[in-house]
Amino acid sequence: MVLMKALNRIIHPQKGWGLIAMTSLMIQGCGQWEHGVPEMNEQERQTVEAYIKTQEPVCIGRFQVAMPQQFKRRYSTLTVNDAQISAKHTTQQMFLRFIRERREELASTETYRQKDRPYLKNLYHVDSDTVVFDHNEDDFTPDSSRILEGYRLVNTTMFKVKLKAIDIDDDRYQDQRKFRKTNKADRLKQVEHLLRNLSPRKPHEIPDTPGLCFDGGFLAGGAEEPIPGAALSFREETVAMTFVDRHYRDVYVHFNANSTIKTEDTLLDRMGRAESIMQAKGDDHFAVLRKGKLELQGIEQAEEWLGTVTTDEDVRGNHFIIEANSQRGSAREPRISVTFMNGEYSLVEDDHPPLNQASLTDAEAAGLWDAITRSFRARDNAF
């Protein structure tokens, strides 16, 4: 488990550069760890073909990939210029009831200090199907820190946009105006703009217009299109989805596209250091199956690394990763990360049985990985 955590901190630069800076375990001659991907036998070939036969297109942000039907989406998140966006199936009656109950909940929330009351500051009725709550960030923080919580109903989909804001218009915050200013009006514009540009989307629907896909919805807008009221003139977009095998819950794929991350090195640069650390720490299950650069349609600077490791479930399993655009980092060329695990439960799998061995063999895992990742590409007209 410790080895996997160390490996993750090196692979994902945003999670911990400290380990790289401190380590001096630069051991040469790692070629002995490169075993290659084993050839599939007939049973393994049938297993992979069963996955391939059911692949269907799935939209992830501004990209798409063909996922086998055996994989179920278990996690989805979208953040655009600090605004968290989500969708939920509902009815108009349930929507109206939710808004009423949410208002009552916020209005009845107490604050730690009397001067920060009321907790619910305002309720903006943008139109008959769109409302925005303006409330304190929490019950303890001064009420200059706000949350704008917007909801919009479109057919049978309720969209939510949540964004932090600052309001120091009250006289007791006069001293703070020297180093920061109220931005609530601008952030309200941002929330309303995002809500207006959201529309429902079916699970396997692939839009042909610029915008971002997320679970249950689509946010229209070009990659270089500014967002009214946002703190930055350019877009910052982060989208992530996790798909878990319905039959083998220790097999999952995680996709992440993040325009805010730009690194000085690449995946293969970092994995050279990771291999040295794994070798020095003595993971008996560690081996490199394949690594190198690869071509993905419409995506530059893509690299992959496929290995065997001792997973967090303390079994021999597979950890595969693709990273692209790591040295570019923009809304038009976001950093892309695709991670595949075999022999380890994802964080979204709360209740699971003990694992004695990984569900797939190395050959099956690599074959499934190739079938999925080689279909990953930029969606037509997405940007």
Question: Could you say what each language-model-derived stretch is?
Answer:
Residues 74-118, 160-164, 238-275, 316-328, ...:
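A short acidic-to-branched-hydrophobic micro-motif
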Residues 174-300:
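Acidic, serine/threonine- and glycine-rich low-complexity intrinsically disordered segments
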Residues 6-17:
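Bacterial N-terminal signal peptides that target proteins for export
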Residues 31-34:
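Bacterial signal peptide processing site
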Residues 40, 45-89:
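N-terminal mature-domain "stem" immediately C-terminal to a signal peptide or N-terminal signal-anchor/transmembrane
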Residues 106-155, 256, 260-331:
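Signature of long, low-cysteine stretches enriched in small and polar/charged residues
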Residues 27-29:
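C-terminal motif of bacterial Sec signal peptides marking the signal peptidase cleavage site
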Residues 71, 167-215, 338-383:
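Surface-exposed amphipathic alpha-helical segments
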